[in-house]
């Protein structure tokens, strides 16, 4: 874990000054809890605080600069401050930590090349960690929670076709798709069937505050067959109450279902032990965020099988699982001793696809509509 790396470095160099930079105070507060030791030679600072106090960079004098979640240093304003710091202390040793060195939505920028001249000491993908049995193999449930807009968009595309024969053919497929979606079990039944630990802890990822509020309103219906009175916690990224809610969620050992609704504060850097699963309520996202959210359900040494509910509101998002599948297939080739000769992705990753019938019809429509 990142906290172990920090602790080892600081213990080995007690007389050196460490400057630890991270995207938010929540991240280093959690890392402090994991370290469980007080060190007087570490100075903690968020990237935004460094940016606001650029004028005091010449007073910092670090021997070691730790860049936590260093892919975030590619952001234009934060990046300027970090570069100014690195230029001011060229002899300071640098340590960067991140789930990925690539900024997927920023022209695939490689921040390991930009900040560390490509020096990567250790790299392990989520898929590799699962294949090598460092992390547990999850149960993965795919379902849709909203499809009205998707059907409307498909209808418009069909109406825009010039060939009447194609219009008629695709309208029939659209009707089949609508029927398949209507006949599929609703989320109330999906959760009742797949959420086998009614007193478990689950992190619910939403795309924004408005989206989170909408999704919380659905909780009474969606989880009614699991627990009629779930404990619901809310984590807004920049609010003081977030720390309190987050701490209460971690401490809750009661007999009720526990749901922590959050936006982005748990995408990176912050870990919660004994989480039984994650619920991804998401539009299409970058691979890094998708894998980080899945990673929140998996903890090394866990004795239980976590469950991932991948709930999407558009068909394109149903294919995000492919990026994890590719990582695992590569790991099977790189580490043949960790599995039997005939073993592959489907043997180690249990997928329950509640969208199978509708997805097949959608693929036919996509091919027809180009």
Residues covered by each model-derived region:
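Interdomain helical connector at the RecA1-RecA2 junction of SF1/SF2 helicase-like NTPases
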Residues: 106-202, 216
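Short, small-residue-biased leader/transition segments that mark boundaries at the very start
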Residues: 1-6
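Conserved helicase ATPase core of P-loop NTP-dependent helicases/translocases
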Residues: 231-263
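Conserved segment of the helicase C-terminal RecA-like domain
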Residues: 297-323
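A short beta-strand element within the Helicase C-terminal
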Residues: 261-262, 268-283, 289, 306-310
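SF2 helicase catalytic motif II
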Residues: 58-96
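Conserved SF2 helicase motif VI
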Residues: 286-302
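Long, largely alpha-helical accessory region at the distal end of helicase-like NTP-driven motors
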Residues: 173-189, 318-370
């Amino acid at each position: 874990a990142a906290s172990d790396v920090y602790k080892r470095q600081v213990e080995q160099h007690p007389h050196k000054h460490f400057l630890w930079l991270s995207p938010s105070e929540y991240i280093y507060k959690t890392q402090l809890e994991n370290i469980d030791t007080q060190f007087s030679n570490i100075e903690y600072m968020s990237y935004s605080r460094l940016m606001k106090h650029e004028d005091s960079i010449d007073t910092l004098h670090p021997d070691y600069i730790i860049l936590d979640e260093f892919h975030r240093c590619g952001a234009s304003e934060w990046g300027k401050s970090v570069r100014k710091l690195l230029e001011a202390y060229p002899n300071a040793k640098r340590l960067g930590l991140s789930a990925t060195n690539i900024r997927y939505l920023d022209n695939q920028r490689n921040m390991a090349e930009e900040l560390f001249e490509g020096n990567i000491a250790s790299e392990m993908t989520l898929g590799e960690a699962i294949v090598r049995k460092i992390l547990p193999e999850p149960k993965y449930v795919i379902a849709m929670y909203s499809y009205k807009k998707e059907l409307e968009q498909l209808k418009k595309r069909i109406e825009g076709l010039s060939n009447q024969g194609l219009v008629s053919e695709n309208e029939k497929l659209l009707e089949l798709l609508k029927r398949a979606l209507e006949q599929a079990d609703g989320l109330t039944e999906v959760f009742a069937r797949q959420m086998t630990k009614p007193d478990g802890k689950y992190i619910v990822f939403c795309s924004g505050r408005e989206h989170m509020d909408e999704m919380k309103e659905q909780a009474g219906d969606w989880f009614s067959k699991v627990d009629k009175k779930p404990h619901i916690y809310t984590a807004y990224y920049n609010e003081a109450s977030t720390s309190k809610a987050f701490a209460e969620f971690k401490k809750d050992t009661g007999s009720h279902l526990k749901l922590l609704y959050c936006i982005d504060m748990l995408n990176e850097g912050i870990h919660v032990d004994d989480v039984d699963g994650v619920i991804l309520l998401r539009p299409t996202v970058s691979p890094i965020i998708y894998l980080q959210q899945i990673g929140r359900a998996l903890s090394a040494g866990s004795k239980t099988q976590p469950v991932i509910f991948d709930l999407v509101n558009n068909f394109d998002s149903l294919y995000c699982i492919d990026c994890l599948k590719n990582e695992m297939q590569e790991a099977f080739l790189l580490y043949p001793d960790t599995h039997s000769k005939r073993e592959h992705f489907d043997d180690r990753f249990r997928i329950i696809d509640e969208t199978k019938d509708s997805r097949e019809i959608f693929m036919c429509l996509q091919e027809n509509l180009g």
